[in-house]
């Protein structure tokens, strides 16, 4: 299900680190504590270091690790940020976290309150409140005569997760994706991210032309 979803989104690679989802919890230390024994933390850290070194990513995007996020998701985000922090500053990818919100959310445009975490004396979850968050409007139209929106792509990807019934409740939900820069990002991170979001606005596929056989739906 995850692989089908990522294929629809155009992901190039899926890497699973084979760690146990032992139960639902909002306590990240159930897996991050050195004596937790749930995840092989040494193997995870080594794998992340190797992946970042080999792939030389421009960006690392995590979920926003808030106190009410699933503890495993918090842990995964923090481990990724740890790996970025272990790199020389000039070689780091830009690190961002994402939240999806409704268009009428009271906290739209406000920075998320993240759990406090540090590694090797560097605060991992401090975020930059300026510039304002980089955003993607899921209601942005596309396709023939702008009949679809980006929300349709998100919904089709979510719909692949049939074994997790609660996931289907997110179909059609969420209007705005907000992306916040972490302080541990390298110099010029804001400018690099701004350039990336400009590129994301470019159409991914050429517009199709429909002949008169399409009747009133023919291209104009």
Model-derived regions: residue spans:
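The feature marks non-catalytic terminal segments
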Residues: 9, 86-220
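Active-site beta-strand->loop->alpha-helix modules in alpha/beta enzyme cores, enriched
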Residues: 1-91
């Amino acid at each position: 299900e995850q692989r089908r979803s990522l294929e629809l989104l155009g992901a190039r690679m899926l890497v699973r680190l084979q760690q146990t989802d032992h139960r639902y919890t909002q306590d990240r230390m159930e897996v991050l504590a050195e004596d937790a024994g749930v995840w092989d933390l040494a193997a995870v850290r080594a794998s992340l270091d190797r992946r970042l070194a080999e792939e030389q990513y421009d960006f690392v995007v995590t979920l926003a690790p808030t106190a009410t996020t699933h503890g495993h998701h918090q842990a995964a985000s923090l481990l990724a940020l740890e790996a970025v922090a272990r790199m020389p500053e000039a070689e780091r990818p830009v690190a961002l976290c994402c939240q999806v919100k409704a268009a009428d959310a009271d906290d739209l445009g406000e920075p998320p309150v993240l759990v406090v975490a540090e590694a090797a004396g560097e605060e991992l979850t401090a975020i930059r409140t300026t510039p304002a968050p980089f955003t993607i409007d899921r209601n942005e139209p596309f396709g023939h005569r702008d009949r679809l929106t980006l929300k349709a792509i998100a919904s089709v990807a979510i719909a692949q997760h049939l074994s997790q019934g609660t996931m289907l409740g997110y179909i059609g939900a969420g209007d705005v994706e907000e992306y916040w820069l972490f302080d541990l990002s390298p110099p010029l991170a804001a400018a690099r991210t701004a350039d990336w979001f400009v590129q994301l606005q470019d159409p991914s596929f050429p517009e199709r032309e429909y002949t008169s056989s399409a009747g009133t739906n023919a291209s104009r």
